[in-house]
């Protein structure tokens, strides 16, 4: 492959392998550097994209893609096809989306048939709507529970797609006397095609196949006319589906299912980062899970692209190995050698000598590693680590010239048993994760072997709730030591047990739980009366989520994990409090990081640090907002106390997920000397290019911050030349917090549609405005409303105007807002009172009835911003592309929550005009871009905590103040006459004065204005 790509950026190559042949497109690219805006000579590693053709392979996708290339060339005879055209023709991501779209449509057809309901997307939310009456089977089989029906359909489809991979190996319906790879690769479709009564295909054909054939240990016997594999492990266990034996499902949906699946190639191999087969692979199961759950994004779950999974797994494994013998692995030769072993790159002579000398030690470390994903989802991260550990072991064994004592499948099985653990609160996630591990073993088997039982490897539980917060109670209980050893033995034996042995071991486990309870009950009453009652709740053999998680009781891991890795849920506490107030209360009680309006991922970091070993590593992909947001204070303090901030790779505005979530890869390791910070420095079109960026990172390309300098205060993280400029600015002694007494958010009414009136027209002492709540115009007294600004009304230097008002049930006395009494409104403002009464029930019902208070039901939800609005101030929208500050000289305007007001401290000599110029300057915008929080489209949030840290010189020369003020006055004058007036010259002069104030040099100014 290297030889092919030495001279060209792209090549089409055919590789022939017997009756199969691979048609590959191999490409490499040069990289555009975002900072310098130039194309760098550094090329990416070559990548191969392959269609598999030949006997038993599908060609529809390839034919459609190649035809598109032909048509494009026909339409543009004088334009050559570009690399982008070829990459589109060989796009794996495109195939994944196509397949998932078809799969989801089939899923929805089945669900709609049973429930009469279908999920549709309204805005960013999935909403269930009734299409038609529910089928009688919803009542008869599913107890009128739509979720039961949805879960059944997911399991059924999951089993079918799993069997598509199995039949690809030739393991279904193997004729008597034939080898295991000579089964029918079209078995499922032919089973349906030949079915006499297709309406009963599920009950008459799939039920026997799933639960009587594939779950039968005798089905593999040679004397059977047709042999099938015995797929134990729980995938075809009937426990959850015993009620549905007679279920009838429409034949036309099955027909659509099989015709769709038959259009795609299924491959049993999961690709390496630089190898891509354009086919449906086992990883697709993860994609299906992460996207199929209609409320998954509401749960904060997002599917992680495999390029990121590969990188995180390799880096975590490297970090783990380096920590095993810090003296041995301290020098650069050791680090480089380990990196190349994990990357499977060619070693030079010195590296090879190191690897050969230390092979046993490295293999031993690889066999002992303990890995946990605390929110396992589809199992992508543990699956990735399984593959990396396997690859590294094989690499070292081949280097030493060892003969393999075990098959690939046996090696993987051993890794799963000794190293892999996962937890998820969602039973569906646990099912899919287990399924992926089974598939990873099936891939490498030449003949079917019993699958391991993963009940004690991947559990359904709430990771965030510990069994007990008193660590001393859990392991030292008089008389319980022998029982605990017995439990460990059951756990070990269960992994490889047969169907009959499983039942016996399950009984043993439950008996031992009860025995433990009886042994410890007297001790328990005096220590923790609930502890062992909670223990009995854990039943790994059911798909019911346990309300707590403990690595020792569930996995036998007492001293912590070496690697905790994953993609934790992103959920704000407000959403959790609405859906599960009990959990919200528990989190705030248990975790220091659960402060303010926290997001769930910060709690996952704290929990991960509790369950990782002292020298272990936590590696998550998650938002970086915690570094500079108020809610991150608790987590920042924890990391500061432990010196645990190790590495952050921030992706900026590049959206790794199909959501407005801005993330980074983040490593946490106790007792780290410094935090390495990297920031995406190039424009990316795809996750492939993201992979190239990650591979290009070197220690010298980051910025390093001593952990001793990181506190609970906001972290200002910048990279490259940017870091030097920010460091220089930060030498200034004052901050915006020293200048402004109040930076306040606008009105929080908790029912804007009632309080805000639109398109207002003066009518003497009254105003006529449109009420969205009543969907009509209403008349109201002028004295009962205030002018209202929304974010869209505020632009840089503009003369502020608005045709909106806010209904304002407060009177201002001595600068304080006091709520009118109901009788006062009734007598003084009868029009306003009539309007409020018309909306009374809505206002009383706000926030679950919190305002159902006589004489106060019309008050705002919060009093923020009420007392300060009628003062001279600056105003700015919360979200903005560049500075958009304006001047409310007379303090006329109130605003929504999306506009902030700025009021100076007494004694600050610089006028509002000067600060208006500074806030609208390029330097201030640059500071926000480098230290703030990016949103879609390059917009940034101008919330208080991002503004306050801006550095301010101790003394600002009078001539600078005067010059900026005069220039701002000129701009405001021009804007009064026409908002379209050109003000570029004045703005440039203001920028130059600000640069001079901060002593910025030509190269620094060029960096800021780039």
Residue ranges of model-derived segments:
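Non-catalytic DNA-recognition/assembly elements of restriction-modification systems
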Residues: 147, 376, 519, 560, ...
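Class I S-adenosyl-L-methionine-dependent methyltransferase module
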Residues: 78, 173, 365-368, 372, ...
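Short, hydrophobic/amphipathic alpha-helical patches that form generic packing surfaces
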Residues: 6-14, 158-167, 208-212, 290-291, ...
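Signature of N6-adenine DNA methyltransferases within the class I
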Residues: 9-11, 18-69, 73, 80-100, ...
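Polybasic, glycine- and aromatic-enriched phosphate-binding surface used to engage nucleic acids
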Residues: 1-64, 242-247, 251-252, 270, ...
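Flexible, glycine/threonine-enriched loop-and-boundary segments that flank and lead into catalytic domains
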Residues: 137-148, 270-271, 350-370, 413, ...
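Class I S-adenosyl-L-methionine
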Residues: 76-172, 181, 251-411, 429, ...
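Conserved hydrophobic/aromatic pocket- or pore-lining residues that grip, position, or stack substrates
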Residues: 288, 312, 377, 433, ...
